[in-house]
Amino acid sequence: MVEFAPLLVPWERRLQTFAVLQWVFSFLALAQLCIVIFVGLLFTRFWLFSVLYATWWYLDWDKPRQGGRPIQFFRRLAIWKYMKDYFPVSLVKTAELDPSRNYIAGFHPHGVLAAGAFLNLCTESTGFTSLFPGIRSYLMMLTVWFRAPFFRDYIMSGGLVSSEKVSADHILSRKGGGNLLAIIVGGAQEALDARPGAYRLLLKNRKGFIRLALMHGAALVPIFSFGENNLFNQVENTPGTWLRWIQNRLQKIMGISLPLFHGRGVFQYSFGLMPFRQPITTIVGKPIEVQMTPQPSREEVDRLHQRYIKELCKLFEEHKLKFNVPEDQHLEFC
């Protein structure tokens, strides 16, 4: 039976719902819409607009691999505050970050739509720069999304950058420090395991970010986002099922995963693509000091990788009881 939302809802909550609705639309369909508009304009009297943009696009092609184009005005827009209050989302600091250093932050888990990563690291809705003065945050995103006209400029405004190695090298090589490059380590594939109560992380063989940290001497910061997996339900797709096989194949072909998720609707609570109103608390752990090693050996990478996993588990265990995680629940790695 469908459970409808009440008619008399405070304007504050309506604005929160609208803020999340536009974000879900942006995540699922804005890139495709931008491509349609770009091509469509070529067949109208406004064709010159697309031609001029194409020229700009050509000249600006490498920008996503060169730190992007973060705009503070965009990051501070009121709409992100409303989106943050919808869940709500909060950011917790457990240690100081020295603004003279550069950092690689591993963000866990991905969730379905990475709401916590976006709000905490690409907007000022949770006060990132107030908690970590002198630190500029960047978040890596699949390169394919920067191939969409107009959309690329939109996502770069929040501090999103291409997930290529050259992009990471550019940010981590900046003199003077103060840069935090966040990587959702589990990536698109981990989204296929995002469901309420899931604590399975795709990390066991993900060592590229460890190698980057060693090559640049960037401190590693583990981040765990409690509640990230509680925003949506997902159609059963355990490994070995035909659905999971199809999803894995599509992920290898396209580079993006296609989780069959569902949440609530705008006017009812029973079904839809809107996330549930579930709190997200993102805990930023203590940085792990890393000695610069321009050409790290496999043993050095493995050693630091194990230390990172140990610190991530410690962070999870220290805080899990505050968020109603069972005492016997531990992180699982695959």
From Swiss-Prot:
Catalytic activity from the UniProt record:
a 2-acylglycerol + an acyl-CoA = a 1,2-diacylglycerol + CoA; 2-(9Z-octadecenoyl)-glycerol + octanoyl-CoA = 1-octanoyl-2-(9Z-octadecenoyl)-glycerol + CoA; 2-(9Z-octadecenoyl)-glycerol + dodecanoyl-CoA = 1-dodecanoyl-2-(9Z-octadecenoyl)-glycerol + CoA; 2-(9Z-octadecenoyl)-glycerol + hexadecanoyl-CoA = 1-hexadecanoyl-2-(9Z-octadecenoyl)-glycerol + CoA
Q: Does the keyword Lipid metabolism apply?
A: yes
Name the domain of life this protein comes from. Answer: Eukaryota
Question: Does the record's keyword annotation contain Transmembrane?
Answer: yes
Q: Name one GO biological process term.
A: monoacylglycerol metabolic process
Residues annotated as transmembrane: 23-43, 212-232
Q: Which GO terms describe its molecular function?
A: 2-acylglycerol O-acyltransferase activity; acetyltransferase activity; diacylglycerol O-acyltransferase activity
Q: What is its EC number?
A: 2.3.1.20, 2.3.1.22
Activity: how regulated? Inhibited by oleic acid and sphingosine, while it is stimulated by phosphatidylcholine, phosphatidylserine and phosphatidic acid.
Q: Where in the cell is it found?
A: Endoplasmic reticulum membrane; Cytoplasm, Perinuclear region
Positions of disulphide bridges = none
EC primary class: transferase
Any single GO CC term annotated in Swiss-Prot or TrEMBL for this entry: perinuclear endoplasmic reticulum membrane
What is the membrane topology noted in the UniProt record heading this document? Multi-pass membrane protein
Q: Which CDD domains match?
A: LPLAT_MGAT-like
Q: What does this protein do?
A: Involved in glycerolipid synthesis and lipid metabolism. Plays a central role in absorption of dietary fat in the small intestine by catalyzing the resynthesis of triacylglycerol in enterocytes. Catalyzes the formation of diacylglycerol, the precursor of triacylglycerol, by transferring the acyl chain of a fatty acyl-CoA to a monoacylglycerol. Has a preference toward monoacylglycerols containing unsaturated fatty acids in an order of C18:3 > C18:2 > C18:1 > C18:0.
Family assignment from sequence similarity: Belongs to the diacylglycerol acyltransferase family.
Write down what this protein is called. 2-acylglycerol O-acyltransferase 2
Gene source species:
Mus musculus (Mouse)
Which gene is annotated as encoding this protein in its UniProt record? Mogat2
